[in-house]
């Protein structure tokens, strides 16, 4: 049986890393607002963030729930740049991304999709969560169509 993957944001990043390390995996991966440039999100910390990292060895950010990010985690992200590490394999990958994503640069999603010949569905006006009226339903319908059809 083929495995189906669904990843959103950081989960999509992890899915792509996994598929890069296991190119023999045959399945379908649908990625919503994929954090394809995860390593750059923490490249330019604010003065307060840099101070916290230097003093405590970590910082707390709030993405709905508090997340503790260690210096090691930030370094690991830099070492796992998908633009360098991703290797297309047997899996069929599709991405969906909002054109107004405030967290993950939409242009980077385009660059990634073009570099690796991945289908990218653009949701015009969509934010990172693709949360405006009708967008969650559009994501579900697009994913279902992708998974159920060859």
Where are these regions (language model features)?
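Conserved acidic catalytic loop of the alpha/beta-hydrolase fold
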Residues: 1-2
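Gly/Ala-rich beta-loop-alpha elbow adjacent to hydrolase catalytic centers
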Residues: 7-15
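Active-site signature of alpha/beta-hydrolase-fold catalytic machinery across serine-
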Residues: 17-21
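The alpha/beta-hydrolase serine catalytic core
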Residues: 25-111, 115-122, 127-130, 134-140, ...
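Alpha/beta-hydrolase-fold serine-hydrolase catalytic core, especially in secreted/extracellular enzymes
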Residues: 149-150
């Amino acid at each position: 049986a083929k495995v189906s993957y669904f990843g959103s944001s950081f989960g999509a990043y992890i899915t792509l890393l996994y598929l890069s390390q296991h190119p023999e995996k045959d399945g379908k991966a649908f990625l919503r607002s994929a954090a394809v440039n995860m390593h750059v999100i923490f490249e330019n910390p604010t003065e307060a963030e840099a101070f916290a990292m230097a003093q405590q060895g970590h910082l707390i950010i709030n993405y709905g729930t508090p997340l503790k990010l260690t210096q090691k985690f930030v370094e690991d992200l830099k070492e796992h740049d998908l633009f360098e590490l991703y290797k297309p394999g047997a899996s069929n990958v599709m991405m969906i991304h909002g054109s107004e994503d405030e967290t993950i640069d939409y242009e980077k999603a385009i660059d990634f999709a073009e570099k690796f010949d991945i289908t990218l569905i653009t949701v015009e006006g969509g934010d990172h969560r693709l949360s405006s009226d009708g967008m969650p339903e559009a994501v579900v319908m697009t994913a279902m169509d992708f998974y159920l059809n060859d």
